[in-house]
Amino acid sequence: MTSWKWLIVVAVLGYGGLLALMYVFQRALMYFPDTARVAPAATGLPQAEEVILTASDGEKLIAWYVPPRADKPIVLYFQGNGGGSNLRVDRFNRLTAEGNGLLALSYRGYGGSTGKPSEEGLIRDAQAAYDFARARYPAKRIVLFGESLGT
């Protein structure tokens, strides 16, 4: 076999191997959870309380909850794939400063929530957060806010 044909074979096999590795490790490449459970007051969000939601498959989800004042909306905050709620406290303080409510969800596998992240699981988690808010507020007062993975 000539050297250029050998080079093509090696390149194709290398590329195929890379694709196989990406397939096998896709979850590790997609989700970067911070698994530490941190109290909201310890991060500079003393107005928030920690609530535990239950997803439809039984996973326990940690969320930080600040009720809205008067007729203000509640923001359901769906974070990105890296870190946890503790890294977003400045944004949460800005959202709640004018009386808006907040429900900041830690997906499964993040921030003390049980389970491992997956696309199907995150959809269940988002539904649990919406159900929590909907049980307390009319739909017109619920605002969905997604960052990166949460969009």
Mark where each language-model region is.
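Feature marks short, highly hydrophobic, charge-poor N-terminal signal-anchor/signal peptide-like helices
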Residues: 1-7
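Short hydrophobic/aromatic-rich motifs at helix boundaries and adjacent loops
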Residues: 2, 22, 100-102
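An N-terminal hydrophobic leader/cap segment in hydrolases
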Residues: 7-54
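Membrane-embedded segments
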Residues: 56-136, 140
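Gly/Ala-rich beta-loop-alpha elbow adjacent to hydrolase catalytic centers
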Residues: 146-150
